[in-house]
Amino acid sequence: MTQLNEKDGFTLVEMLLVVMIIATLAAMIVPRFAGRAKEAKIAAATADVRSSIAAALDLYEVDNGVYPTTEQGLQALVGAPSTPPVPQKWRGPYLKKKGGFNDPWGNPYQYHCPGIHNTEDYDLYSMGPGGTEDGNGQITNWDDPTKS
């Protein structure tokens, strides 16, 4: 068995110095990434509203000739609606979504068909980081520059 020498290991001062260096580095790095979570949530909601959910709604419309009604909602993308107009050619699920259709902040995506802003099809939006319908921070499909 080997014996420990007094010179083996680290002194308390050395350990405190290492902890201080790590804390200083963390204090410099963490603020740089703190705002990234909000940006990532906005990007995810934008992708849902303008791409993935929108594409699923368009596939539903191609198969059935109409978009789901407001009452049928986004659930019509994962299960065939039983409320009128009952789709005769439903080929879903159009999205593989477990649970509800919630944005990254935990609020349900809002879907209206026919839409107020998009009267030819539907309005789809997230209430955004604020979680209110006052228009502040909403992520919508009616201000989508790629939609014509």
Where are the regions a protein language model picked out?
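Hydrophobic single transmembrane helices highlighted by the model
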Residues: T11-M15, R36
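Alpha-helical hydrophobic helix detector
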Residues: L16-R32
